[in-house]
């Protein structure tokens, strides 16, 4: 089995079999070297090459092994070089002053498109230095500029299409076990250089080496120009079938399982560091390991064996398929059958993420200012999002706003809809909290032509957006809401810091009816929910909505946190934002679900979400629950479960798992505190649950699987008495005072009076609630 695997892996990285002598290489045999350490290093080198799937030819490996059995002599040194030199792309000479000079070696300059090729580098180290040995190339520079946070790309960051095309390589010195990143100090040793080519065909590259700062020789002699011949890879055509047999888009993570030079995503195909969405056949993102392909599309892979992990968002069960790409063929076909554990759309619930971006954060701002929104739509399809709001914001604002139409993106269809809307972030009001504006008709604030002219606090922007039919809320709510004294208790009564960009000024604007939804799912749950619970306890009826803030808080995938909504009428963008306003939705990581939440038969999001009781008494609470956890917790799940809730992923069902079981707890919440719990098996099956709590005062009820999913509230009024928890109102008033202290210095002088009046108006609201709650 080991022999056949080794042969197969040779097919992945066949360069070490390309041994024809380079026409112009000189004789670089080095004498006067101790044979014992050189032979020991050669044996480690052979072992490392085997680990990386690049073993020496069998005959050469046998010759090396034979040298171990013979006497150690000058002949041993010569024979080692005779065996290894034909594999060398370059010969590096470090003179006694530590200067590096590079010559061409004997190996043929043959690469493979879309794959790694390994060569040896012979190092004649006269200086005996032990610095880190590195390989570089201008052809391996980043083919993009990232991260991006500028409103417009800076001139010095601009890359032309020609520059991008010339950056087709990745190059690394392999320093994994049993090798090491530093030179040993021995007069002669060998290193392994691994080169990846994005392209096929003839390509010239400049390859350079150094052994620490300032080691380059005069006249740029530490580099060589090499004309490579990159052999074409195999076209692997994908046939992707959904659970019902229809063709679809899905997510694919392709790995070879081999040892590569250290670095992010080095064993992943296509190599992320060479991906440029603007110019590639398919717009794969360089900061993600996965790619997205629909049936009929393809990926190019060099011959070899691969592991493909494929799925389509959290409603699907991830699967693994091993594929073999043979040599000597132009293309092959591979089929993938997706497997769901649940299909919420069939139950009347549709997935949505109101916060994704085509620019900023992990995206590049050159060669283009972010990606085209149509590239984001592939991500939406591949993660099975029915609805997505692609938000233009500060970074690359002036370019990205050109995609704003106040209509659905043209690629939208009956099952998947995307619209370009706005996040007011990177604007003068951002210090008070970033805000999401959905379904707006106009994206320029009245009287402005530049970002700098927008208001410096959030209320005017919210009011303007709502005046044009927009549905609005604060983004990444928990940022800035960390308690002054650390606690994860829910609810808690510690004043928040109010020093961030989340739902900070929400404490003001919620009192004026300016907020439709409160974002959840992408910041620590205690910070998000503590603010939310306290404002509900003051009688405000803001609804929860799930968001990811891709690719900022996470660049893993869109829809990592999401809403599931039940449209009142059509499943379209209007139906979606209406469902958010009404609370016909719940927040979820997609791995647990709280459907059809009702109190005395009234479903959340209907009839003002309010149940009226004449006097204290019991109510019947029902919901339909579904959750999915693997039967056995894997290492990734265990890591998530043990991580502090202040570390990502903030919302994940692994945090909800009861010990090592497959059980999660559905909690009934009244006014923010759990009052009952039911254990549910996370086996993917639908489970109907019910509670019968006694309600002794006006308040609100919700169901949560913490921190994986959370329903919207249903409000219960007894004898039409208001919901007014004194302690919550006191907390809100303290938070308001802290917010003014932190935000007032950054509000423009000419706007400060209006802001001060709004804060004072909110103070009066909370004081009245405190007085009401005291009765």
Language-model features, listed with the residues they occupy:
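Positively charged n-region of N-terminal signal peptides that target proteins for export
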Residues: 1-6
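Bacterial N-terminal signal peptides
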Residues: 7-17
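Long, low-hydrophobicity ectodomains and other hydrophilic envelope-associated domains
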Residues: 31, 36, 58, 65-230, ...
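Mature N-terminal segment immediately following signal peptide/propeptide cleavage
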Residues: 33-60, 251, 350-355
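C-terminal functional module detector
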Residues: 151-153, 163, 168, 172-177, ...
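A short, Gly/Thr-enriched small/hydrophobic beta-strand-prone motif that recurs across taxa
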Residues: 230-244
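Catalytic cores of extracellular degradative/oxidative enzymes
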Residues: 292, 315, 319, 345-544, ...
């Amino acid at each position: 089995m080991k022999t056949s695997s080794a042969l197969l892996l040779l097919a992945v990285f066949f360069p070490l079999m390309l041994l024809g002598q380079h026409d112009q290489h000189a004789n670089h045999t080095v004498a006067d070297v101790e044979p014992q350490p050189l032979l020991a290093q050669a044996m480690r080198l052979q072992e490392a090459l085997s680990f990386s799937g690049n073993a020496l030819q069998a005959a050469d490996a046998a010759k090396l092994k034979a040298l171990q059995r013979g006497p150690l002599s000058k002949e041993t040194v010569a024979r080692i070089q005779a065996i290894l030199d034909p594999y060398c792309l370059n010969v590096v000479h470090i003179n006694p002053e530590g200067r590096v000079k590079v010559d061409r070696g004997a190996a043929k300059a043959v690469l493979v498109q879309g794959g790694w090729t390994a060569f040896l580098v012979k190092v004649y180290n006269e200086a005996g230095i032990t610095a880190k040995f590195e390989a570089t190339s201008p052809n391996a520079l980043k083919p993009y500029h990232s991260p991006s946070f500028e409103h417009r790309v800076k001139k010095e960051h601009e890359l032309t299409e020609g520059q991008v095309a010339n950056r087709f390589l990745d190059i690394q010195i392999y320093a994994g076990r049993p090798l090491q990143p530093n030179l040993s100090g021995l007069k002669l040793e060998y290193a392994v250089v691994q080169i990846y080519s994005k392209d096929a065909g003839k390509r010239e590259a400049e390859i350079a080496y150094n052994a620490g700062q300032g080691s380059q020789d005069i006249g740029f002699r530490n580099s060589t120009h090499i004309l490579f011949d990159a052999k074409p890879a195999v076209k692997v055509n994908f046939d992707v079938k959904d659970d019902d047999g229809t063709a679809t888009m899905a997510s694919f993570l392709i790995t070879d399982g081999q040892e590569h030079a250290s670095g992010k995503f080095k064993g992943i195909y296509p190599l992320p560091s060479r991906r440029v969405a603007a110019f590639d056949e398919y717009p794969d993102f360089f900061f993600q390991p996965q790619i997205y392909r629909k049936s009929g599309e393809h990926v190019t892979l060099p011959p070899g064996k691969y592991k493909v992990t494929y799925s389509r968002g959290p409603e699907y069960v991830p699967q693994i398929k091993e594929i073999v790409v043979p040599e000597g063929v132009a293309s092959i076909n591979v089929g993938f059958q997706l497997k769901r554990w649940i299909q919420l759309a069939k139950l009347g619930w549709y997935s949505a993420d109101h916060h994704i971006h085509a620019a900023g954060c992990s995206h590049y701002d050159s060669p283009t200012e972010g990606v085209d929104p149509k590239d984001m739509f592939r991500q939406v399809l591949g993660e099975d999002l029915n609805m997505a709001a692609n938000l233009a914001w500060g970074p690359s604002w002036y370019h990205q706003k050109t995609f704003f139409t106040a209509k659905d993106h043209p690629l939208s269809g009956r099952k998947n809809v995307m619209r370009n809307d706005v996040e007011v972030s990177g604007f003068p009001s951002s210090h008070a909290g970033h805000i999401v504006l959905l379904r707006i008709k106009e994206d320029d604030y009245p009287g402005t032509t530049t970002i700098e002219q927008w208001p410096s606090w959030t209320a005017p922007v919210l009011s303007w957006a709502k005046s044009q039919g927009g549905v609005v809320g604060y983004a990444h709510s928990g940022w800035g809401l960390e308690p002054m004294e650390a606690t994860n208790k829910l609810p808690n009564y510690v004043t928040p810091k109010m020093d961030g960009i989340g739902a900070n000024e929400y404490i003001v604007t919620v009192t004026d009816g300016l907020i439709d939804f409160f974002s959840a799912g992408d910041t620590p749950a205690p910070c998000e929910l503590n603010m939310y619970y306290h404002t509900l306890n003051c009688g405000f009826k803001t609804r929860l909505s799930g968001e990811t803030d891709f690719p900022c808080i996470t660049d893993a995938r869109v829809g990592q946190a999401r809403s599931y909504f039940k449209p009142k009428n059509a499943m379209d963008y209007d139906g979606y934002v209406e469902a958010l306003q009404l609370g016909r939705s719940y927040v979820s990581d997609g791995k647990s679900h709280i459907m059809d939440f009702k109190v005395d038969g009234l479903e959340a999001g209907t009839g003002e979400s309010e149940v009226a009781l004449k006097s204290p008494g019991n109510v019947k609470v029902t919901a339909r629950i579904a959750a999915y956890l693997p039967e056995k917790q894997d290492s990734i799940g265990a890591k998530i479960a043990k991580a502090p809730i202040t570390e990502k992923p903030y919302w994940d069902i692994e945090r909800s798992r009861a010990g090592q079981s497959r059980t999660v707890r559905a909690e009934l919440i009244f006014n923010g505190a759990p009052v009952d719990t039911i254990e549910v098996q996370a086996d993917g099956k639908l489970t109907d649950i019910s509670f019968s709590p006694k309600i002794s005062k006006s308040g609100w009820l919700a169901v949560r699987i913490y921190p994986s999913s959370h329903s919207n509230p249903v409000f219960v009024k007894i004898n039409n008495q208001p919901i007014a928890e004194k302690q919550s109102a006191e907390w809100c008033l303290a938070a308001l005072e802290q917010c003014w202290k932190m935000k007032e210095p950054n509000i423009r002088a000419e706007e400060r009076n209006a802001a001060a009046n709004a804060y004072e108006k909110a103070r009066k609201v909370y004081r009245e609630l405190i007085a009401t709650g005291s009765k």
